């Protein structure tokens, strides 16, 4: 073992750090060692997969594009299965969405740079729905906040909330520093949340919004009167990651590590009732005006969510434009099942690779977005400069 700063490296890691595997591996290992020093890691661990953010041209701009194309030119490549976060547009249907040629050209260059590094251009915030499904206890380096929450909490994998460059560096080296949620002692509950009312639909996002603001970077432990679905947990985790910085939570009797979470030792506890949920739902809306665009799929819709939307749209037409956001893989399955035809016959559009948060929706003339995602409601006013209306998707479609 060789010590570099506070982090000990094995012989292979030391060779990476010394440049024996090339400049880009060396640069990436330097990033990982620096992160390890900052956060007090003692060593590196192998990762089984990576999930890389910093994909939308809207968010990374020309500086990010140049950084990625420089890595590509220097022959960078990933060592583990790696998937991409959403881009700023549907890579196939961007013209139908109304985005400019210039934006599209630069967005495509970003995705091509990642593809050249062997990062799978899946462009989704739900990699666990399309095959990037780490085993319980395995170490990964994921960066999308809602995906990090799902991986840690629902799958029982181990990841910190990586920045885009850190996740890419981990993917290139196949390593990440062992600190934070990679360590068992940091995965115990710090806040007990007793939910005293029945929840459905966007109530889970409202609950996450409440909890994230209180928990901050802590680890909530929930007790429910009902049994949340996987899609409910997806919405809950995404909301907590946006209103706070929650990257791991436990649900009594549901999530894989709940028996090891030590909820009785949590330092704080809260109760949440129906009045709290109603107040949060009202707070998440910034206007009483009707939306001129409904955006569903933050995080990206599962196939079952699209099935239910299509079933509803057989008898109901949206009062305004409608986007149903998902991954290309789930979108393809929705097309095969006939769900896309139903949604688009009703006036909606199934869009892949992107979402309302990282797409330049503000350039399309919309003023009010209707969302059933607390994460989207939290981000849209700041990132898009638009008002948000928060409600169940059925209420948004049929006001």
Curated annotation (Swiss-Prot):
Q: Which domain of life is it from?
A: Archaea
InterPro entries the record matches? PMDh-L-like_dom
A Gene Ontology molecular function term of the record: lyase activity
Positions annotated to bind (R)-5-phosphomevalonate: 54-56, 85-86, 144-145, 375
Where does this protein hold [4Fe-4S] cluster? 125, 298, 355
Q: Which cofactor does it need?
A: [4Fe-4S] cluster
Biological process, per Gene Ontology: isoprenoid biosynthetic process
The UniProt keywords, alphabetically, are: 4Fe-4S, Iron, Iron-sulfur, Isoprene biosynthesis, Lyase, Metal-binding
Protein family per UniProt: Belongs to the AcnX type II large subunit family.
Q: What does this protein do?
A: Component of a hydro-lyase that catalyzes the dehydration of mevalonate 5-phosphate (MVA5P) to form trans-anhydromevalonate 5-phosphate (tAHMP). Involved in the archaeal mevalonate (MVA) pathway, which provides fundamental precursors for isoprenoid biosynthesis, such as isopentenyl diphosphate (IPP) and dimethylallyl diphosphate (DMAPP).
Oligomeric form and interacting partners: Heterodimer composed of a large subunit (PMDh-L) and a small subunit (PMDh-S).
| PANTHER family on file | DUF521 DOMAIN PROTEIN (AFU_ORTHOLOGUE AFUA_6G00490)
Protein name in UniProt = Phosphomevalonate dehydratase large subunit
- The source organism is Methanothermobacter thermautotrophicus (strain ATCC 29096 / DSM 1053 / JCM 10044 / NBRC 100330 / Delta H) (Methanobacterium thermoautotrophicum)
